[in-house]
């Protein structure tokens, strides 16, 4: 699954949807952490209550101190981590869009954050302030493939989302399309 999905392409408007936390890996970890946390919590409670709360095991025979309390502690931590994953999926943290509009000569970058006053992060730049587009390609154990917008006085602003790096051809094509649309140079390829 790509980090950037083209949504609108026209002569005057280019818009990409950026996938935030709603990636398959986050769904996997949300399910795994919730299930594991619930299992450990029930095992710890079973040892405390001396009553089997798990149908596939007999944790009631565990001694509460130290085994049961450790299971309960790790179960609560796992459940809280699972809850965080589910909330990040619900809130779609990091999701948003990149919009390039020739009519207004504006670039709008929108990302979703945590609930509150500043839930939506919105950055706007003029076409005239864009110096170039930079592509970062790093292979190896922790690969990185990202597109950055180089803006005067602002440095490099990432346009790609987090997660699994998109295929090399896809990142090159997207960077070339954006650079042509903005009429700026492309660095790093």
From Swiss-Prot:
It is found in: Cellular thylakoid membrane. Disulfide bonds: none annotated. Signal peptide: none annotated. The keyword Membrane applies. One of its GO terms (biological process) is photosynthesis. HAMAP family: Ycf4. Belongs to the Ycf4 family. This is Photosystem I assembly protein Ycf4. It comes from Synechococcus sp. (strain JA-2-3B'a(2-13)).
